[in-house]
């Protein structure tokens, strides 16, 4: 009996030790090892895999363009409601390359020049690029609307310049071949010696709206000037000294902050360049990225858990918000709070130099009035929302980038009448979509398998160890404790006692008395317990007298 109790005690102690060791390994040792391995893999130090992938992504991003073809331009010129048709997409491969890199060990920064290259893939496109579309004229209307809004005193000079450069001036809309609009370029004749024409050409050149073609002509396109050319000089943190700073933008073109918006807070570089993010983020953190195309940072917020390629992920979405009701963002307004862009949109005119409004495609998530003002729009979450799939434990520790993402942005013109202009005086006040772009990537099996085998199998192993030790340790400890403290209870049968009649020999009853607690018969006579004998009636009578 003593030996069994000692064995139960040993087993219980062993189970408690297993439980404690499992908890220490699962919640202490393994996370520390994993964190150390992640840090070593995501730092932007020379010679690491992540550095090589950061400098040149080994696969192209998906870049898709949709054009909003205006189907009733003449009606709009008379003040009618616009009607558009979303056509596309045109599919391009987008290659990002960072070159001329310089490491600063003391500052823990990496300096590089970014170059974007787009390659058209007609085999993956719904259009050939040869189609003719109609859109608001980006140069004519862009110049007139901006000058009327910000420099009205110059309107007579600008009107004269527009009449010369775009003679004959017949419409506020441009009919153009799609590929000319996007990349090949539209010719602008600046050969006139008239002062107004030369001043207008000089202004468009200085603003970067057009690109010189020869001594007398310029070209305008949405992306041609940026294709396979320098996209700025960047400085970002490498994350060696502080892993939370990994990829964070320090400066752009030697400027540590912008000088675009009316407020210091809006002019800050917040986040990364969107190709890498720091690890160890939580659901409470936003995924911030700064984009020079829109001169501001945007932060995606956590929505719910998700799956990608069978792997558990976290789903993030981007919301443009409502600037009018966000005091900390009033510096993005022209004159807050009365003159802010509608809900779900951004005023990009300070950044792009034209009356351009940014939003999600088809004004998804924006003020419903914007959709109602234009026929042909059909907002759809699956096709038009901005999303990112992340693995929050490490943010894809082998690449430091999202496993699947789609960044979608629509560019619209803030159209309106030109005062005292016989041709453009009846244009409606409307935000008219021109085109929208989708930039995204989804990792294939080659990359998701790396994530699966290098990270998730380790996490599964840790989870298995944790739960096995918890179950075995807890059950074993409780069971051993129960067996150790359990005492055997033995029960003896109690014999029935005969009740004697007065005529029965008293000794016979006494012989049957049982000591229940000791399990042994008591002696037949116990001093002090025998009853006195009964007196006969004659003896009782004599005793009285």
From Swiss-Prot:
Biological process according to GO: sensory perception of smell
Keyword Heme attributed: no
Transmembrane segments: 11-31, 465-485
A GO MF label: scavenger receptor activity
Keyword Lyase: no
One CC-aspect GO term: membrane
Tissue distribution: Selectively expressed in antenna.
Compartment(s): Cell membrane
Cytoplasmic topology ranges: 1-10, 486-545
Biological role: Plays an olfactory role that is not restricted to pheromone sensitivity.
Family from the record: Belongs to the CD36 family.
Protein name: Sensory neuron membrane protein 1
Source organism per UniProt: Anopheles gambiae (African malaria mosquito)
Lineage: Eukaryota, Metazoa, Ecdysozoa, Arthropoda, Hexapoda
Gene: snmp1
């Amino acid at each position: 009996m003593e030996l069994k109790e000692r064995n139960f005690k040993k087993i219980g102690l062993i189970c408690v030790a297993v439980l404690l060791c499992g908890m220490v390994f699962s919640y202490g040792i393994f996370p520390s090892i994993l964190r150390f391995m992640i840090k070593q893999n995501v730092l932007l130090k020379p010679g690491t895999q992540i550095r090589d992938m950061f400098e040149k992504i080994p696969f192209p991003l998906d870049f898709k363009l949709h054009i909003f073809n205006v189907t009733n331009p003449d009606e709009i010129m008379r003040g009618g409601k616009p009607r558009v048709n979303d056509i596309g997409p045109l599919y391009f491969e987008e290659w990002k390359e960072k070159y001329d890199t310089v490491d600063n060990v003391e500052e823990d920064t990496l300096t590089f020049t970014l170059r974007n290259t787009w390659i058209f893939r007609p085999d993956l496109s719904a259009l050939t690029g040869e189609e003719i579309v109609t859109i608001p004229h980006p140069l004519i209307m862009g110049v007139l609307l901006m000058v009327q809004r910000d420099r009205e005193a110059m309107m007579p000079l600008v009107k004269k310049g527009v009449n010369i450069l775009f003679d004959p001036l017949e419409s506020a809309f441009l009919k153009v071949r799609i590929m000319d609009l996007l990349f090949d370029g539209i010719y602008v004749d600046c050969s006139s010696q008239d002062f107004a024409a030369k001043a207008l050409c000089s202004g468009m050149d200085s603003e970067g709206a057009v690109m010189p073609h020869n001594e007398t002509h310029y070209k305008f396109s949405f992306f041609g000037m940026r294709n396979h050319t320098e996209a700025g000089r960047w400085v970002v943190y490498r994350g060696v000294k502080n892993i939370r700073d990994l990829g964070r933008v320090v400066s752009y073109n030697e400027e540590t902050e912008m000088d675009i918006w009316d407020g210091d807070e809006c002019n800050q570089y917040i986040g990364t360049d969107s190709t890498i993010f720091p690890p160890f983020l939580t659901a409470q953190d936003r995924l911030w990225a700064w984009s020079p195309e829109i001169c501001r940072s945007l932060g995606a917020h956590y929505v719910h858990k998700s799956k990608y390629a069978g792997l558990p992920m976290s789903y993030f979405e981007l919301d443009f918000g409502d600037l009018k009701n966000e005091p900390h963002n009033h510096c993005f307004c022209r004159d807050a709070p009365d003159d802010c862009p509608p809900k779900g949109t951004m005023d990009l005119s300070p950044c792009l130099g034209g009356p351009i409004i940014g939003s999600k495609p088809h004004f998804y998530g924006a003020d419903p009035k914007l959709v109602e003002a234009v026929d042909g729009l059909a907002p759809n979450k699956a096709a038009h929302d901005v999303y990112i799939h992340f693995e929050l434990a490490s943010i894809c520790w082998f690449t430091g980038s999202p496993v699947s993402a789609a960044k979608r942005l629509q560019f619209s013109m803030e159209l309106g009448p030109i005062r005292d202009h016989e041709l453009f005086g009846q244009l409606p006040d409307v935000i008219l979509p021109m085109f929208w772009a989708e930039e995204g990537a989804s990792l294939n099996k080659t990359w998701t398998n790396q994530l699966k085998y290098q990270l998730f199998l380790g996490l599964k192993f840790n989870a298995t160890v944790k739960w096995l030790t918890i179950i075995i340790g807890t059950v074993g400890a409780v069971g051993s404790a129960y067996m150790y403290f359990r005492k055997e209870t033995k029960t003896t049968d109690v014999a029935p006692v005969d009740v004697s009649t007065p005529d029965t020999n008293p000794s016979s009853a006494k012989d049957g008395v049982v000591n229940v607690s000791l399990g042994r018969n008591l002696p037949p006579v116990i001093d002090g317990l025998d009853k006195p004998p009964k007196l006969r009636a004659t003896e009782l009578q004599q005793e009285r007298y």
